[in-house]
């Protein structure tokens, strides 16, 4: 027993001496930031896929490959190839994705350390990222989507996040999201400030601009709405003496429009301001209700022995309503 205790004491004493003279690195030395100026961390971001862009929730789901590369001379070794160590055993810049909502990391948290002390960390992340959207032009809008990284525990003088020119950042050409088309992307250092009064920390952002493909909304929203509005014009071609038929058609059109509004509600973003699509739907609704009011007016005129005036009003409305609707469509959907 005494020999065992003596052996443990000698081993611990020798280890302390080796650490003190730098023969082996101490754990505390490795997990502290290198003191030789700001640590330059080279970042690579590649968007493997974008699964969904949700305008209503103002977020997007993406599959992202992220790579960090930095140099720590304290980790240099005499081996002939890179060694693998757990990430939490060495110092690392602790970079966070600041606009994540839910994020899953699929690669193990390990690093490869080259003989010269270069550290390489690779990770694949999948999840949801928040993105405030300006939807005034919906659905004819273009949006910029970003993934913002930040070394939140370090100032810009302690850690620098830079674009890695040795590895290509970018975005895949074929994406799962079918109703958007990527136009361009950028990857660049971008300081991160949690609040306007706080000091900026070192940051990096990958952004891509995308245009919404409007084919879905033309087929599912715009064309059906045009047909419903056009159906309301049928009342102008029915003789005012047939007031029952006119009112029946007008009410049927109105109820169809109300049901249609409920059906498309899930496809429209819930924002506090009116989008171009909202203006189109709102003005179309007003025109449908206006046709019902016109039917009531002509029916009243016909019953009051003013049939000629009622027919003249219908003839004017046959042209006025389509022209007004065309102006509404151009102003809200084109200009």
Describe each region flagged by the PLM.
Residues 24-209:
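Soluble non-transmembrane domains of integral membrane proteins
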Residues 18, 64, 293:
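A residue-level signal for conserved active-site and pocket-lining positions in enzyme catalytic cores
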Residues 8-20:
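Bacterial N-terminal signal peptides
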Residues 1-6, 324:
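Positively charged n-region of N-terminal signal peptides that target proteins for export
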Residues 204-324:
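Channel- or pocket-lining gating/hinge segments that regulate access to a cavity or pore
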Residues 330-335:
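Juxtamembrane boundary at the C-terminal end of a transmembrane helix
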